[in-house]
Amino acid sequence: MTWICVITLFALASATLGNKVSRVGVLFPKTRNDNECTARGGLKGSCKSLIDCPSVLATLKDSFPVVCSWNGRFQPIVCCPDAIAPPPVTTTAVTVISTKEPKLPRLHISGCGKRKVKIDITTVGRSGSPILPPISTPQNSTGGRGIIAGGVEAKIGAWPWMAAVFVKNFGIGRFHCAGSIISNKYILSAAHAFLIGGRKLTPTRLAVRVGGHYIKRGQEYPVKDVIIHPHYVEKENYNDIAIIELKEELNFTDLVNPICLPDPETVTDPLKDRIVTAAGWGDLDFSGPRSQVLREVSIPVVPVDKCDQAYEKLNTPSLKNGITNNFLCAGLEEGGKDACQGDSGGPLMLVNNTRWIVVGVVSFGHKCAEEGYPGVYSRVASYLDWIAKVTNSLDHAVTN
């Protein structure tokens, strides 16, 4: 390439000598002496043979040099700059794309997760069954099925965030599902309980009772709306979560208080080997009688991969993607303890320093307390962004 440029210079020079008039942009600047010159860019330089000026040789393909003279017809003497001009400084607008996950909201209602009725944290219910047994020795099934299959009756006031949802027909309310209080206006529940046959239950037909131990007691509140997760699809089990908005605000008492939502830091926590508690008024057995009092059961968390292997055997179309990390699974390997029909929408709870947190929403299972099939819950931590949006960050009633 260099020699092509030299030949080009020679051709240009020949044309110049032949016509005696320069017709190209080759400059012959006047200087104080024959050796000094001004190179392109205004740099001071000295006249040298092209071969002896590497900086000019390097730029021949981009621009013609300043020619001082010719040594014969084939050797141009060029203005070789004494110093190389620094490249021009350019500024380019740079868009920085963060690779970090967006910060999840911290949704805490002041005083949430506290039980105002004094209860021994290691024993609950009339039978004194431990709700937080040692992790290394989880509870064994007694063979009987109580809860919510396999549980015990809760002590009055043990779970002040429990809510019972009723559907009214001709003015008569019928128990429909459960939920958990997360603020004075919102109840967390399951989507599948409110979307039936492609239609959402009319809010005016719904009522929520709180503060009751017996299923037919408690304070009743009308429902303003039910917000179903936008990605929930009927007859599938994914994104099975909903929020009930009440027409009137709840009055918090010893028997009515919100449960805490998970901290953002728990989103990826598998809760391995943790003992969790479910509560509700559901069936005492699969297709069995319904409980008339609030019951509870404590069960260990089952790893998602193990849970997925279990449900893969059923080859059910409602789980086309298997059990994902947006679920939590819990139950005894030998069965005997589980949530059951009617417990849908109720909370799966975890205690942390005496503060109770809703980590799951009762979603589905294979029958109830079936051996080898843990209960499956919508993982609340996976939906914190959606909950914050729907509740307008719990209507700003948030404390960090």
Curated annotation (Swiss-Prot):
Species assigned in the record: Tachypleus tridentatus
Subcellular compartments: Secreted
Protein name (Swiss-Prot/TrEMBL): Clotting factor B
Gene3D superfamilies attached to this UniProt entry: Trypsin-like serine proteases (2.40.10.10)
Active-site residues, Swiss-Prot/TrEMBL: H192 (charge relay system), D240 (charge relay system), S344 (charge relay system)
SMART domains: CLIP, Tryp_SPc
Propeptide position ranges: 104-124
Domain Peptidase S1, chain residue ranges per copy: 148-392
Residue span, Clip domain: 36-80
Pfam families per the UniProt record, alphabetical: Trypsin
Domain notes: The clip domain consists of 35-55 residues which are 'knitted' together usually by 3 conserved disulfide bonds forming a clip-like compact structure.
Activity regulation details: Strongly inhibited by alpha2-plasmin inhibitor and DFP. Partially inhibited by benzamidine, leupeptin and PCMB.
Gene Ontology CC: extracellular region
EC number: 3.4.21.85
Domain of life: Eukaryota
